[in-house]
């Protein structure tokens, strides 16, 4: 909780840049729409990782004019954007690393599902500077109790 509060105060107190929250949010939205839509390819994803990284760096140059702590919608929107930016970075970086198509992730360069290499959860950590560390976690295919049977995974067919 203390780390979160420190992050919030840091954003509020050091936001003397020249880029508005609205500008950054719109740039992030456009980048995600263009580079992380449902149908993706390696080139688009790689461009998107770079583009979104550049946009995320602009969070260091965000401007918050209202420094109050009461009814400060500008601060709230910036804190929301900070959270959304982290989610966007994780989403696009995870998608660029996954060399298969699965569920809502359709990779045009890898149209098949690959359970042998990709039956795993992608886990990512972001540091204070939005640098990411990628990891993986096994998928649990069994149920917690014997009350219900486990269902084997199958490819989605539309």
PLM ranges: what are they?
Residues 61-158:
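C-terminal amphipathic alpha-helical interaction region
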Residues 13-88, 92-95, 100-102:
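C-terminal non-catalytic alpha-helical accessory regions
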Residues 6, 37, 150-153:
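Glycine-centered secondary-structure boundary/capping sites
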Residues 1-11:
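Single conserved hydrophobic/aromatic residue that forms the stacking wall/gate
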